[in-house]
Amino acid sequence: MATIFTKIINRELPGRFVYEDDDVVAFLTIEPMTQGHTLVVPCAEIDQWQNVDPAIFGRVIAVSQLIGKGVCRAFNAERAGVIIAGFEVPHLHIHVFPTHSLSNFSFANVDRNPSPESLDAAQDKIKAALTQLA
């Protein structure tokens, strides 16, 4: 059965995409730890990061680095946080989010009900930042 991320990638469910190529996509999470919290996901369904083909994992990491630069620029952040948790959705994904503090590295701090407007604004800011970086 397809994961929720595969359904988002295939446009069966909505997603706020900020990056996409043949192997990897990046879209905003619906439960951000900070504004601009983005998920970087391989298009292929791979459950655990340690089982992914090294070439695909390299692409996921390269896109995560690009998204990290984008979220830092978009939100004037000191750093980009990165987490590979491996729970909730059985499809490899890397959390990339703008941060100024180690205290942001907690899923207990997520916004469980962000406004659609704030997510749309974050998407626009990240896409603009990525365009500037290109």
Curated annotation (Swiss-Prot):
Q: Name one GO molecular function term.
A: catalytic activity
According to the lineage, what is the superkingdom? Bacteria
Motif placement: Histidine triad motif: 91-95
Residue ranges constituting the HIT domain according to the UniProt record? 4-107
Gene Ontology BP annotations: nucleotide metabolic process
Kindly provide the name given to this protein in its UniProt entry: Uncharacterized HIT-like protein ML2237
Identify the species of origin.
Answer: Mycobacterium leprae (strain TN)
For this protein's source organism, the top of the classification is: Bacteria, Bacillati, Actinomycetota, Actinomycetes, Mycobacteriales
